[in-house]
Amino acid sequence: MMRIGLFLLTNLAVLVVAGIILSLFGVGSYHGAGGLNLGNLLVICFVFGMVGSLISLLMSKWMAKKTTGTEIIDPNAPRNQAEAWLLQTVAELSQRAGIQMPEVGIFPSYQSNAFATGWNKNDALVSVSTGLMERMNKDELRAVLAHEIGHVANGDMVTLALIQGVVNAFVMFFARVVGDFIDRNVFGRQDGEAPGMGYFAITIVLDIVFGILASAIVMWFSRHREYRADEAGARLAGKQAMISALLRLQAESEMPDQMPKEMKAFAIAEGKEQGFSLAALFQTHPSIEQRVAALQQLNCP
């Protein structure tokens, strides 16, 4: 579940860069003597928004490895029984889920956590923390792996990219509409005059502000997909094992979160936040209680 935080951070960076390029080199295609050409602007923003989101998606696996320090297990030469068991279990779950074997890795973290990412379901990465390996029994660990395989099989990252691309398009569109309004009514730009530096500065700031606010839509999808991944984990590894794994994660919820901020939404668990906490609209996960309650209603062994 760390996958979305990384995706959002990368996407925001790409969105800002795309916005700068659009403002500097594309302004003439939607800004004329009569003001904004809203049709042209919407098309251009849609193209830039989708491209930015797809770049984030394509970079997600590489950035996940670098950000978490994930070390990939050589499928032909596991170094110990634990690594061999991980490879065997992921291979079995992947086959049952109907996807190709993903890369399997381990990242250093005392906190029990895991994530899956990748640009498509047949080119994915599943990684677990050292803390997860040390403190969960095999049934619980298998359930966590099944949960992550569920994310991959459900195509969550691709769906996220499509949602984020549409969100990006509207963020860039409204940033430029509002920026044009401010440039005319606050900075006094007259009809026929080219946008000045004030317009460019405003649109870049609005890209960031609107991008953060619009992430609430993506966070809603993140919360929704956790239930689906929990269900997949329960069907692949057993409902009680999935519930047991979640309850163990809940027992560690008072631990400070060691996951890099940009990876939190990719993780299966979030530790206790230190200091200010964002509103519920920006939470990447439902509560453990909500997830367990949903699993208990599930009709499966």
From Swiss-Prot:
Top-level EC class as recorded in UniProt: hydrolase
Residues at the active site: E148
Cofactor binding mode and count: Binds 1 zinc ion per subunit.
Major localisation: membrane
Example GO biological process: proteolysis
Protein family membership: Belongs to the peptidase M48B family.
Protein name: Protease HtpX
Origin species: Acinetobacter baylyi (strain ATCC 33305 / BD413 / ADP1)
Phylogenetic classification of the source organism: Bacteria, Pseudomonadati, Pseudomonadota, Gammaproteobacteria, Moraxellales
